[in-house]
Structure formats: C-alpha cells, structure tokens
Amino acid sequence: MASQLTDAFARKFYYLRLSITDVCNFRCTYCLPDGYKPGGVTNNGFLTVDEIRRVTRAFASLGTEKVRLTGGEPSLRRDFTDIIAAVGENDAIRQIAVTTNGYRLARDAASWREAGLTGVNVSVDSLDARQFHAITGQDKFRQVMAGIDAAFDAGFEKVKVNTVLMRDVNHHQLDTFLAWIQPRPIQLRFIELMETGEGSDLFRKHHISGQVLRDELIKRGWIHQLRQRSDGPAQVFCHPDYAGEIGLIMPYEKDFCATCNRLRVSSVGKLHLCLFGDGGVSLRDLLQDDAQQYALEERISDALREKKQTHFLHQSNTGITQNLSYIGG
C-alpha cells in the first residue's frame, strides 16, 4: 500500500467525495434554480463503473476509508447499484455513503443497502410540504419522508439529513426540526449557505451564520461531540433527551479548513482539491486499464502538493464552482 495521502500542511485525507453525475431532477433555489442545463460533460460522458472501480481502488490504496457518492442526484444513474458494489470491492473502504434528494429512496433503499451502502444523507430544507415544494421545485415532500422511513426499515441505523440554513426561510424553525428528531436517530445537519458563482445574490439575501444556532443549542444543553478522522466537516451535538443529533457545517468559521480530510473527484474524472478551488487535475486518461494504477496513484499524490491551506470564500472567491451540482457539493 502506498503512503497515506498527506498535504503540505500535515492534513491527512481519509475521505473521497465522488460525483457520478451532475444531473439533478430538483430545482433547489440555492443550487439549480433554473433546473439542470447540460453543458459541463465531455463527449466521454460520466465515469463508467469500471472507471469508478479503478479510481476508488487507487484512493483506497492511498489510505481512503470513506467514499461518498454525490451528484447532481446519484440515483438518476441506472447503474447506481452496480457503482455501490464496485466501490465496495475495496476492503480498505469501510464506509460507502450517498447524498441524495431522496425521491427514489423509498423504492431503492433496501437494494442499495444490499449492494453495500452504509450511509444515507437526504436533503430536506423544510418540514413544511409547501415550503419544501417552493425550495426544491418538486412536490415530493411526502415521498422523501417515506424514503427516510424506508432507509430505517432497510437497516440503516442512522440517517443524516442535510438542511441548508437560510435567513427568513428556515433559520427560525429550530423547534420544529428538534421535535422531529427527538424520537428518531437522525443526524440533522444545518449547512451554512455558501456563495457560488451563480448564487451571489441569493447568498447576500439569505446567508446567516450557524453560530446563531450553535449558541442556542449550547444554551439548551446540547453537548459537542469529538470528531472521528473520516468524519465530514460537521460539528456534532447530542442531548440526553433526544434520539437524534444536530450537526453544524460552517465553512465561513475561522479555521474551518484546518481539519480538512476530504478530496473530490468530479463526474468526468477530475480531481478537485477543494470545492471552491480553481481548475482540477484530470485523472481520466489513467482510468482506462488496471495496469495504470501506480501512475494514477502518483498523479493523485503529486496533485495534493498544490492544495491550499484554506478556501477564499471570505473574499467571495468561489473558484470554478458555479453551482453545487458542478463538482458535488
């Protein structure tokens, strides 16, 4: 096995976010308000199952323990179950998760679990069906809620729910969310609205710091939990009276990048060192044959030397990320 992926700032990388499509059938106001518009995909299309098998094998050899499949909406891939199984061929990868809008979860949760999926994140920005429709452009609230129930029925012990925190939209609904997770083992993760190239106006209108919620949680007796090395960026809080947990993802907080442990590969095979970085390193030419694995590992390791210490969101520099479906959020 090659050495553990480590950058110039001694950060170790155990977590790969792998986008498998940039297509999405929802029109969320903060991501794709005008719906999906083709244009970012080359003639080669999205990564094939074999290419996904090779890239995850290389990352596993370099110390990756967790792979999250993202999009777009990953379940729009007809071969999604095969993709899960391909990633699971790597014994070193202990966790395989998906971030989904949940519209196919009720139908497919059991088959995904059987294929090897170990974790599910579902995007739910409101518990009010009408507001959910307004945010997502889809009248699918009850279908998504049924999907979360189906995930538990399929054997997932915990479901993570992602909620983008937006001023005057849902920031005042903490009590409603807390009542929902009190009897349920759901980790509800409030994610600060992030500025993207296409979303500057929305950001200025609706951004609110997660610190407001953190202060309120601490006041109510919620306790900050220790972070594991392959965990995502959320600060997680628990409370003895609740089956669920609260996570806060606050990319504008000081030192947010100090604990970065994740890298990204786009749906067309580009390595991105940061969600809000520039450019990207193409890996695709080294995903065509198993014999290329050593060269692939070398290219990944070499690219990591260029990873910056921090993003530049505070300067409104969003890099190449025009919207969050482009690389995989």
Curated annotation (Swiss-Prot):
Q: Which Gene Ontology molecular-function terms are recorded?
A: 4 iron, 4 sulfur cluster binding; cyclic pyranopterin monophosphate synthase activity; GTP 3',8'-cyclase activity; GTP binding; metal ion binding; S-adenosyl-L-methionine binding
Query: Where does the record place the Radical SAM core domain?
Result: 8-234
Q: Which Pfam families match?
A: Mob_synth_C, Radical_SAM
State the needed cofactors, names only: [4Fe-4S] cluster
Q: What does this protein do?
A: Catalyzes the cyclization of GTP to (8S)-3',8-cyclo-7,8-dihydroguanosine 5'-triphosphate.
Question: Assembly and interactions?
Answer: Monomer and homodimer.
Name the UniProt record assigns to this protein: GTP 3',8-cyclase
